[in-house]
Design a protein with these regions (language model features):
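Middle-to-C-terminal accessory/interaction subdomains
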Residues: 1-138
Length: 138
C-alpha cells in the first residue's frame, strides 16, 4: 500500500536505516496519473492515518515541530526558496530542449493541469496547513 507515499526506507547493513524521496508523481497535490489535483493543500495525506506514520508523529512530535520551525525560520521551507530552486533548475534547460520534451511526450496529462504558478500556490497553501499542524508562527 501507500503507507510511505513518496518515500523509501533503505539500508546497506540492516542496522542503520535511511529515509529518502521516491516516486514523486503525486507531489504538490497531483493525482498519480497526472490528470487532476487529487488532494487539497489543506488536507491531511492518507498516509497520516497509517499506523507507522501515527507512531512517528506521536513519538517525534517535539523534534518534528522543532525541525519544521528551523526550516521555516531559515526560509528553507518557503515559497521563495521553492521559486529559487525552480528558477535554477529551469535555467539548465534551453527552450529548444523544452520543446523537444513536449514533442516527445505530447499527451503528458499534467501539462494541462499543473504549472509553476499552480505548484507555488499549492505549496503556499500547504505551508499554511503545515504551520498549523506543527504550531508554527513567525
Amino acid at each position: 500500500g501507500d503507507r510511505a507515499k513518496n518515500a523509501i526506507f533503505y539500508t546497506w547493513d540492516g542496522t542503520k536505516w535511511y529515509f529518502g524521496p521516491y516516486d514523486l508523481d503525486t507531489t504538490y497535490g497531483l493525482h498519480f496519473n497526472g490528470t487532476q489535483i487529487s488532494y487539497a493543500a489543506d488536507s491531511a495525506p492518507k498516509t497520516d492515518s497509517g499506523t507507522f506514520w501515527k507512531k512517528i508523529l506521536v513519538t517525534y512530535a517535539d523534534e518534528l515541530s522543532t525541525r519544521y520551525a528551523e526550516l521555516r525560520d531559515k526560509d528553507i521551507f518557503s515559497v521563495n526558496c521553492l521559486y529559487d530552486i525552480a528558477a535554477e533548475l529551469s535555467s539548465k534547460y534551453t527552450h529548444e530542449l523544452d520543446k523537444a520534451e513536449i514533442n516527445k511526450w505530447p499527451t503528458k496529462p499534467s501539462l494541462t493541469v499543473t504549472s509553476r504558478d499552480q505548484i507555488f500556490s499549492w505549496f503556499n497553501d500547504r505551508l499554511a496547513y503545515l504551520d498549523n499542524k506543527f504550531n508554527y508562527t513567525r
